[in-house]
């Protein structure tokens, strides 16, 4: 992936990066047709979103904008999300897997279906404006035996067991629910207590 930004977030000067310039110039015609380039012709090689190199190495939940697939995956730090792929960062890999399991549940799906505009055959959208409205159990407040059961169901893609476990978590008297607010980038959950 070619990142046209300096570490401080400024767009690079192509004269200072001849190899990047050669590559970008070879695709200039196509790049100039984009809305972002038409808006600012002097910065025709600018990307719509700034690239954050550290994001690639961070564990994250990957969410497609629209998908008929009920499975949600956690990247342990090998991929960079682009285009219509949202991500959630924060917490440990285990916490992100618990969050993914909860997001795959019928409990969350029913909430999403009631608050989103469904697209492409009735599939809900995973945009942050909708995710902010979800009522979710606090991953740090889930009883350990239920957390292990939920992780086992998630790792086995056993949706029946996952939904049964999620129902037990939601009905548990000690489970706290929180509406999480994004902090930076597309969507970030803060797992601090």
Predicted regions mapped to residue ranges:
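Non-catalytic DNA-recognition/assembly elements of restriction-modification systems
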Residues: 19, 138-193
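Polybasic, glycine- and aromatic-enriched phosphate-binding surface used to engage nucleic acids
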Residues: 1-148, 152, 166
């Amino acid at each position: 992936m070619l990142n046209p930004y300096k570490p401080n977030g400024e767009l690079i000067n192509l004269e200072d990066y001849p190899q990047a310039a050669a590559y970008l110039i070879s695709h200039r015609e196509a790049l100039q047709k984009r809305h972002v380039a038409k808006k600012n012709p002097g910065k025709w090689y600018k990307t719509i979103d700034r690239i954050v190199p550290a994001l690639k190495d961070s564990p994250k939940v990957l969410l497609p904008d629209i998908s008929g697939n009920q499975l949600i995956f956690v990247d342990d730090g090998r991929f960079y999300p682009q285009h219509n792929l949202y991500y959630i960062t924060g917490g440990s890999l285990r916490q992100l897997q618990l969050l993914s399991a909860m997001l795959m549940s019928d409990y969350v799906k029913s909430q999403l279906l009631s608050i989103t505009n469904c697209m492409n055959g009735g599939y809900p959208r995973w945009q942050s404006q909708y995710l902010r409205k979800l009522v979710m159990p606090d991953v740090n407040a889930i009883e350990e035996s239920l957390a292990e059961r939920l992780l086992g169901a998630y790792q086995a893609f056993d949706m029946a067991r996952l939904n049964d476990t999620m129902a037990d978590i939601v009905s548990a008297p000690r489970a706290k629910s929180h509406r999480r607010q994004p902090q930076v980038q597309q969507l970030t959950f803060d797992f601090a207590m």
